[in-house]
């Protein structure tokens, strides 16, 4: 078959004479094999391109996580330093070349005390911790205030001329062991104070008149559990509602806001999100009738039906809510165990193993969040005193513990923190920081070089 054209395609491989194009019959088998070859080549190139994109992405993700680990290490370092500074009033931690000045001592005391009234400036009706429990918030270990107060009374009688915590732990009162509160009990009962991120695990919102966990969307349910189980709540000065299981000597009203001020506090009974009972009982905050009215008004604003809700107002009996009267008759608490997740305190309500609220452990382990500001959920860094002093002494010439003032190069650039700064921290902090960003799930010696520097 010939097709005649008015154009001249002399240079065309299909031309057949001047001005003519000859289209010969096509061999379909040859075309098919040629197409298969092209398709295979396309598949190979696509696969190679995908692998390259994955490598670039994984490399970027690893670099970002390594950079994040430096941020985590810096925050862990300052948490360890903060604890050491708070603990300095109890045990001489730093090897100062000269005695601590009065100004330095007052700065440390004001730092501790400032945590007690946090939030008072936001709302006029906010309530701070009862005076008896200030000592709990100031104590770096947050030992149960009721127990500490017994030793505080003995310290007042002794007139030893020593600061209370120094007298209690290393001074004249170190051998004092009260029958009503033995040393073992004082050491064991330490109140857990939540950080900003930990606090989110206990936050609840009101949706269509029912109390719902903010993160999981599950209804609050306190009806199941062993007899005597108590669920407590606080409402912050920002009108955020927090609730969880009370654990004597471990988790109390002061735990939610780390000793900060509240608008309301008490105890609740909730059946699948439906409020049944409100009790304005809190030994830590000792709420008034006004605070209870404020909380009831908050519930009404959020369409909670209070017609069938049993309300117990604050009274003198609230002082015994935290088991002050019957603390001597109760059984000794179980030894403290390390908690794997911040949500665990809310799920250990049932001796039969029936948790009332779903755990977020698996979700937390499988998700990686790069938001590190505002605290790390208080992951306490176990840094030996020797390692801390070694780093402090190495930085004395710069007279600063700020990382940006220690290194020859800047702490961060326009694209973020410098990965090389990780080598400036103790090994324990580096390992914990890598675990936090899911780069090192378990401690492995292979992650560290023989010199103790990070192999990255």
Curated annotation (Swiss-Prot):
Expressed in roots, rosette and cauline leaves, flowers and siliques, and at lower levels in stems. It is found in: Cytoplasm; Nucleus. Residues 46-75 form the IQ domain. GO terms for cellular component: cytoplasm; nucleus. Keywords: Cytoplasm, Nucleus. InterPro entries: IQM. PANTHER family: IQ DOMAIN-CONTAINING PROTEIN IQM3 (PTHR31250:SF10). May be involved in biotic and abiotic stress responses. This is IQ domain-containing protein IQM3. It comes from Arabidopsis thaliana. The gene is IQM3.
């Amino acid at each position: 078959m010939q097709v005649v054209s008015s154009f001249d395609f002399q240079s065309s491989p299909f031309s057949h004479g001047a001005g003519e194009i000859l289209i010969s019959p096509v061999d379909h088998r040859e075309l098919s094999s040629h197409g298969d070859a092209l398709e295979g080549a396309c598949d190979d190139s696509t696969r190679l391109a995908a692998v390259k994109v994955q490598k670039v992405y994984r490399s970027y993700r690893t670099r970002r996580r390594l950079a994040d680990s430096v941020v985590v290490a810096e925050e862990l370092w300052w948490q360890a330093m903060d604890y050491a500074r708070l603990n300095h009033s109890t045990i001489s931690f730093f090897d100062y070349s000269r005695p601590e000045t009065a100004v330095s001592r007052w700065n440390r005391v004001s730092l501790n005390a400032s945590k007690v009234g946090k939030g008072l400036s936001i709302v006029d009706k906010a309530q701070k911790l009862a005076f008896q429990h200030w000592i709990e918030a100031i104590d770096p270990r947050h030992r149960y205030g009721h127990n500490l107060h017994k030793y505080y009374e003995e310290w007042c009688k002794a007139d030893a001329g020593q600061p209370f915590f120094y007298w209690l732990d290393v001074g004249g009162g170190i051998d004092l062991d009260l029958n009503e509160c033995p040393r073992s009990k004082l050491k064991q009962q330490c109140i857990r104070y939540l950080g900003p991120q930990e606090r989110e695990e206990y936050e609840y919102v009101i949706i269509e008149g029912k109390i719902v966990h903010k993160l999981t969307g599950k209804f609050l349910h306190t009806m199941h559990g062993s007899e005597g189980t108590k669920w407590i709540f606080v409402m912050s000065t920002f009108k955020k509602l927090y609730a969880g299981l009370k654990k004597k000597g471990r988790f109390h009203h002061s735990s939610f806001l780390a000793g900060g001020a509240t608008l309301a506090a008490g105890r609740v009974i909730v059946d699948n999100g439906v409020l049944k009972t409100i009790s304005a009982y809190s030994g830590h905050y000792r709420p008034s009738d006004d605070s209870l009215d404020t909380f009831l008004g908050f519930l009404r604003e959020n369409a909670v039906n209070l017609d069938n809700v049993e309300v117990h107002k604050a009274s003198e009996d609230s002082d015994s809510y935290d088991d002050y009267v019957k603390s001597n008759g109760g059984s000794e608490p179980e030894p403290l165990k390390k908690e794997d997740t911040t949500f665990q305190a809310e799920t250990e309500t049932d001796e039969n193993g029936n948790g009332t609220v779903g755990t977020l452990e698996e979700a937390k382990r499988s998700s990686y969040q790069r938001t590190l500001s505002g605290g790390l959920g208080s992951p306490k860094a176990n840094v030996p005193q020797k390692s801390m002093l070694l780093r402090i002494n190495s930085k004395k010439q710069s007279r600063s513990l700020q990382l940006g003032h220690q290194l020859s190069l800047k702490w961060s650039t326009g694209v973020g923190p410098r990965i090389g700064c990780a080598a400036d921290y103790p090994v324990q902090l580096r390992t914990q920081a890598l675990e936090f960003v899911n780069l090192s799930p378990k401690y492995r010696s292979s992650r560290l070089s023989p010199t103790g520097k990070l192999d990255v």
